[in-house]
Amino acid sequence: MSPVSPRSLTLIGAGLAGCLLAILLSRRGWQVTVYERRGDPRIKGYESGRSINLALAERGRHALRQAGAEDAVMAKAVMMRGRMVHPIIGQPQLQRYGRDDSEVIWSIHRAALNVALLDLAEQAGARVHFYRRLHTVGFDAGYARFIDDRDDQPHEIHFQSLIGSDGAGSALRAAMQRKSPLGERTEFLDHSYKELEIPPQPGGGFRIEGNALHLWPRGRYMCIALPNDGGTFTVTLFLPNAGEPSFATTRTGDEALALFARDFPDALPLIPQLREHWEEHPPGLLGTLTLDRWHLDGRALLIGDAAHAMVPFHGQGMNCAFEDCVALADQLDAHDDLASAFAAFEAARRDDAAAIQQMALENYLEMRDRVDDPDFLLQRELEQKLQARWPTRFVPHYTMVTFLRTRYSIALARSEIQRQILVEATRGHRDLSRIDWAALEAVVHARLEPLDGAH
């Protein structure tokens, strides 16, 4: 084991956040070493229990720009203009995310993104070691032991500081807990998810509209499909763990076929391997992680899902983690010692992480229960009118979170005010013909200040 340099950082986890942080820090002169428990996905293929599709929003793209990684990533992304809502009876309807094609989100395959960021991290000067599972940490001595699970051989290092970018099941978080309790709490949803696939057409290309997130809302449960650049869609079914229907009552491939035939009839013929994939892919858990502390003075820090994992229903987990990376790099520039930088990072990000965790839970209810509800559709219509009239004051929730980089905590607070305005203004109305615009103008100007960045 060799001594560490004064500007060296050791990252645990070479996933998306770990690789992006490695790029940012290496470009700013840090000596960065990354340890990853799995093998190199560029050699052995990508392995993960995580969702294989992600939604990239403006705040995530901004972070990629800071790392010089945007062009490499966007070459692999597919534009999504909005939600294509599929009712049980009737034709699908597109609900645009924004005003035009300047306000869209992007679907990207997790494996392609991870490989692109890995390449860029190594090009920036970071050293990445694979098959290194964190086993033991001596925080006082600055010592860590890793195990290569191929041969059970230990590998020991000295470190100045550890940064945990190793996800919701973080090994570094577990080690920190043993040293000093972090107040860890995880609240699991009573729903889980399972992933399936829509293959491309025989001659290539998408079987359904490729530039949309497809959504089949069914009250207590729902199905979504996100496009990939190869013409496939990743389909995710979110279903209760108990009750009818649920994962408890839909265990076999044949039971899954019956569920889709009844509740998702237009999706069923698009998924030829439904029976096989249902039986091969175990359900994934959905939960929200909170901690009282994210760091151990200057010796260790958690970022991204390792610090604040969230449910996936706002498509912001990766975007939030990427924001973490930029915020941490900035705090490291602004402070002379790691303990101060880590404390400032946590103070800057804690409220925003809690806000997007709450909004992600709320968005699940909207997606599964409300997108085909007449009251919701009327409120959405009014929201668009209010944005057109007062674009810097009445900024839709989705715009603040996805197309702008408004702090999540500010977006949450403004969204709650705007929701109240929409509900009160549309109560008792079937359309907008009798809306009192003068009264609404007074309410909007009284309750909503102009928002930085809105236009």
From Swiss-Prot:
Gene Ontology biological-process annotations: anthranilate metabolic process; kynurenine metabolic process; L-tryptophan catabolic process; NAD biosynthetic process; quinolinate biosynthetic process
Pfam families on file: FAD_binding_3
SUPFAM superfamilies assigned: FAD/NAD(P)-binding domain
GO MF annotations, alphabetized: FAD binding; kynurenine 3-monooxygenase activity
Cofactor: FAD
Enzyme Commission number(s): 1.14.13.9
Pathways involved: Cofactor biosynthesis; NAD(+) biosynthesis; quinolinate from L-kynurenine: step 1/3
UniProt keyword annotations, A-Z: FAD, Flavoprotein, Monooxygenase, NADP, Oxidoreductase, Pyridine nucleotide biosynthesis
Reaction equation(s) it catalyzes: L-kynurenine + NADPH + O2 + H(+) = 3-hydroxy-L-kynurenine + NADP(+) + H2O
Top-level taxon of the source organism: Bacteria
Function field: Catalyzes the hydroxylation of L-kynurenine (L-Kyn) to form 3-hydroxy-L-kynurenine (L-3OHKyn). Required for synthesis of quinolinic acid.
Similarity comment: Belongs to the aromatic-ring hydroxylase family. KMO subfamily.
Protein name in the entry: Kynurenine 3-monooxygenase
Source organism of the structure: Xanthomonas euvesicatoria pv. vesicatoria (strain 85-10)
Organism placement in taxonomy: Bacteria, Pseudomonadati, Pseudomonadota, Gammaproteobacteria, Lysobacterales
Gene name, Swiss-Prot/TrEMBL: kmo
